[in-house]
């Protein structure tokens, strides 16, 4: 099937890259400690990586229209297919893909409905390699439209998705504060320096540097901004999220659009809200429900303090969802099994966020027992392992460790103190 082949090509590259991602994160963390310039906080990193896990797991619960449209175009409307065995097909596809990625990325900042899908990637107020893995779960809704021309041009599907995966993997390493400007390389390619600009909320850096592989598009279309020594980047978004909850991270702009559309008295504005330039609001709604203006001179990162054991528990749950996702990806699952597995990923990420936000332990423990009972039932009945015994062992091991944590967390003496940045 067209869609199965398309998925497998991209997924394999990303899955193979994961061990290198983990190693690079460890090395960056170690380097920051040595240089006494740590750029990691455990709570922010758990939040970013949890969103990355949900993004990768999203394919188990969605049926994207994009692949079907691509198939129709390839069969009925495209130019003759290019030869995927020729090197120039791949080079051409790489350049063309990045060109359309530039416009997707740019519109993802300039149009509210596309910003709603992209905003999760920018919410981190740290800038490190885990930020690169902080991905949306809703980009599939409209992002595919921008790459239709590649299929019309006759570029084979396996080439498109492969160069897309390579483009995505390339972007991983540019999410770091530790790499300085790179001379001539800055003129052609996306680098850590010019991508730091992209993630900053400073006035002079806003809405700049959209390229994925090549920075040439930004220079050509007037959206390039060099990183300035006199203007240190302040990372994050205007109107900070102030939450580790992945559901809020993925939906808050959609919710804001819906609220503005609902409250405005003008029918034209009810539609315009969704497709307007980012930041625009109906005048009557902006007057009735004003939003707080961002003052970067008073900026403080969202960083609720929690007991050390809570932080360790959060890391344990991150390891669990990452392991579960890996098992889901390496085994053929029935659709409802995949759907149930993604539900486990989501509920675990949400309850972990409750802990990391510093909510009272007694309330969290009650929610955790409910979640754990549901999770263990799903793991036994519809687990990701290839056999029932494997599912039972996986569920038993996870349940035993989880219950041990909850026993300690329910004791008041372990619910005090706080943990600093990693």
Regions found by a protein language model. Give the residues of each.
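Membrane-interface helix-loop junction between the first two transmembrane segments
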Residues: 26-46
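Membrane-embedded catalytic scaffold of the fatty acid hydroxylase/desaturase
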Residues: 53-62, 84-246
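Substrate-recognition/cap regions that form aromatic- and gly/pro-loop-enriched pockets
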Residues: 301-417
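Hydrophobic transmembrane alpha-helical segments in integral membrane proteins
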Residues: 9-22
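Cytosolic/stromal cytosol-facing helical appendages immediately following the last transmembrane segment
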Residues: 14-17, 126-130, 173-313, 398-422
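Juxtamembrane "helix exit" motif at the C-terminal ends of alpha-helical transmembrane segments
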Residues: 11-12, 62-81, 144-160, 164, ...
């Amino acid at each position: 099937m067209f869609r199965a082949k398309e998925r497998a090509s991209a997924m394999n590259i990303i899955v193979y890259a994961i061990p290198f991602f983990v190693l690079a994160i460890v090395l960056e963390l170690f380097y920051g400690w040595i240089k006494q310039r740590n750029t990691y906080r455990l709570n922010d990193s758990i939040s970013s990586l949890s969103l990355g896990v949900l993004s990768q797991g999203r394919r188990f619960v969605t049926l994207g229209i994009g692949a079907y449209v691509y198939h129709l175009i390839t069969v009925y409307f495209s130019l003759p297919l290019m030869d995927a065995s020729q090197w120039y097909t791949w080079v051409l596809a790489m350049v063309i893909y990045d060109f359309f990625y530039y416009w997707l990325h740019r519109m993802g900042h300039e149009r509210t409905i596309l910003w709603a899908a992209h905003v999760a990637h920018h919410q981190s107020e740290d800038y490190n390699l885990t930020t690169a893995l902080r991905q949306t779960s809703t980009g599939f809704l409209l992002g595919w439209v921008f790459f239709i021309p590649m299929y019309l041009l006759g570029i084979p599907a396996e080439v498109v998705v492969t160069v897309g995966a390579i483009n995505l993997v390339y972007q991983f390493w540019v999410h770091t504060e530790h790499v300085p400007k790179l001379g001539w390389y800055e003129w052609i390619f996306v680098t850590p320096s010019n991508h730091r600009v992209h993630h900053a909320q400073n006035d002079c850096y806003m809405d700049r540097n959209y390229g994925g592989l090549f920075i040439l598009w930004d220079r050509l279309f007037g959206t390039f901004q060099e990183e300035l020594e006199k203007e240190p980047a302040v990372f994050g978004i205007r109107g900070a999220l102030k939450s580790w909850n992945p559901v809020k991270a993925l939906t808050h702009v959609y919710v804001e659009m819906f609220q503005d559309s609902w409250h405005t008295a003008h029918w034209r504005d009810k539609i315009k809200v969704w497709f307007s330039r980012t930041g625009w609001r109906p005048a009557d709604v902006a007057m009735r429900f004003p939003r707080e203006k961002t003052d970067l001179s008073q900026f403080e990162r969202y960083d609720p303090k929690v007991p050390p054991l809570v932080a360790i528990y959060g890391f344990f749950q991150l390891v669990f969802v990452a392991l579960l996702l890996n098992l889901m990806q390496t085994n053929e699952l029935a659709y409802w099994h995949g759907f149930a597995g993604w539900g486990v990923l989501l509920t675990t990420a949400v309850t972990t966020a409750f802990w990391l936000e510093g909510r009272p332990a007694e309330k969290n423990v009650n929610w955790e027992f409910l979640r754990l009972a549901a999770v263990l039932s799903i793991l036994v009945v519809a687990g990701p392992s290839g056999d029932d015994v494997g599912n039972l062992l996986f569920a038993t091991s996870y349940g035993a460790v989880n219950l041990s944590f909850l026993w300690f967390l329910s004791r008041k003496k372990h619910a005090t103190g706080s943990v600093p940045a990693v």
